[in-house]
A protein has these predicted regions:
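Symmetry-related core transmembrane helices of the 12-TM Major Facilitator Superfamily/SLC fold
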Residues: 123-141
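Helix-to-loop junctions at the C-terminal end of transmembrane segments
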Residues: 17-30
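Interfacial helix-cap and linker-helix signal at transmembrane-aqueous boundaries
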Residues: 24-26, 110-119
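C-terminal transmembrane helical hairpin of 12-TM major facilitator-type secondary transporters
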Residues: 29-79
Length: 167
């Protein structure tokens, strides 16, 4: 029973991150930099967890990482409709889900392999933190959110609804 209560702590943090970061991203009308910041927060949390394995600070690190992981979902999933519409948007979302499912398999496998090699979870957590940093760099350097319908304005969070209404 204690394990269940302890496991709940990072996910409460994640739920708070999901709601609060999504609201912040909508209020700022900004996706890329919110996604980048969430990736950095996740990386910091994973490094803290890796440095403090076996202590309560590891739970704090995992909670920070989960806050960032779940906080990235709102900005991330609002982006595909800004780039594509109709069947192209559906196909891109399906492709993203397929890659995510592969990550759901290979992520735990990778952490387990690193734990077997090093006798510690720290290496696996550092590797996942490195992937979060790579995600942040890709966001900063390569992600350019297009203008909706070439209006010269920055993309709005409700741009997908406008396009759907026009179809």
């Amino acid at each position: 029973m204690t394990v269940g209560w302890l496991t709940m702590i990072p996910y409460i943090s994640g739920g708070l991150g999901l709601v609060s970061w999504g609201m912040l991203s909508d209020r700022m009308n900004e996706r890329r930099w919110n996604l980048l910041a969430a990736c950095v927060v996740s990386a910091i949390g994973l490094v803290i967890a890796g440095l403090t394995i076996g202590t309560w600070w590891a739970m704090v690190g995992l909670s920070i990482a989960t806050f960032g992981f779940y906080g990235s979902k709102g900005p991330f999933w609002s982006m595909p409709p800004m780039f594509m519409t109709g069947t192209a948007a559906a196909a891109s979302i399906a492709w993203i889900n397929s890659i995510g499912n592969l990550g759901g398999f290979f992520g735990p496998w990778y952490v387990g392999v690193i734990k077997d090699w090093t006798d510690s979870y720290a290496g696996g957590l550092y590797g996942l933190a490195f992937l979060c940093v790579i995600s942040a760099v890709v966001c900063a350097l390569f992600l350019d959110i297009p203008n909706p319908a070439g209006t010269g304005q920055k993309a709005r969070p409700d741009a997908a609804a406008d396009v759907a209404a026009a179809d």
